[in-house]
Curated annotation (Swiss-Prot):
Protein's job: Located on the outer edge of the platform on the body of the 30S subunit.
Swiss-Prot/TrEMBL keywords: Ribonucleoprotein, Ribosomal protein, RNA-binding, rRNA-binding
NAD as UniProt keyword: no
Gene name for this UniProt entry: rpsF
HAMAP family noted in UniProt: Ribosomal_bS6
Family affiliation: Belongs to the bacterial ribosomal protein bS6 family.
Pfam short name (any one): Ribosomal_S6
Subunit structure: Part of the 30S ribosomal subunit. Forms a tight heterodimer with protein bS18.
MF term (GO), any: structural constituent of ribosome
NCBIfam families in the record: S6
Protein name: Small ribosomal subunit protein bS6
Cellular-component GO terms for this entry: cytoplasm; ribonucleoprotein complex; ribosome
Keyword Cytoplasm: no
Length: 101
């Protein structure tokens, strides 16, 4: 198991119920691929450096997870096929991973 950071940019035009549904689907996908979520941060609506799908903004989510190495690409692929997911980036965590005591 390795530690990863999962960065996701969602469609900025989602209402609260759609946003909650997308977060639930993302959480389920992480669990289905054997990820143990350690930390979640909702960075909210942010301006993008360049428009994605003609939107100058995106709703940002950041997850810190521990998961099997061989499942990372499958997870990223599943998240990318969602219509409301604009971008997905999964990177190995650089900082020491400390569990809450």
């Amino acid at each position: 198991m390795r530690r990863y950071e999962v960065n996701i940019v969602l469609n900025p035009n989602l209402d609260q119920s759609q946003l909650a549904l997308e977060k639930e689907i993302i959480q389920r996908a992480l669990e289905n691929y054997g990820a143990r979520v350690e930390k979640v941060e909702e960075l909210g609506l942010r301006r993008l450096a360049y428009p994605i799908a003609k939107d100058p903004q995106g709703y940002f989510l950041w997850y810190q997870v521990e998961m099997p190495e061989d499942r990372v690409n499958d997870l990223a692929r599943e998240l990318r096929i969602r219509d409301n997911v604009r971008r997905v980036m999964v990177v190995k965590s650089q900082e020491p991973f400390l569990a809450n005591a």
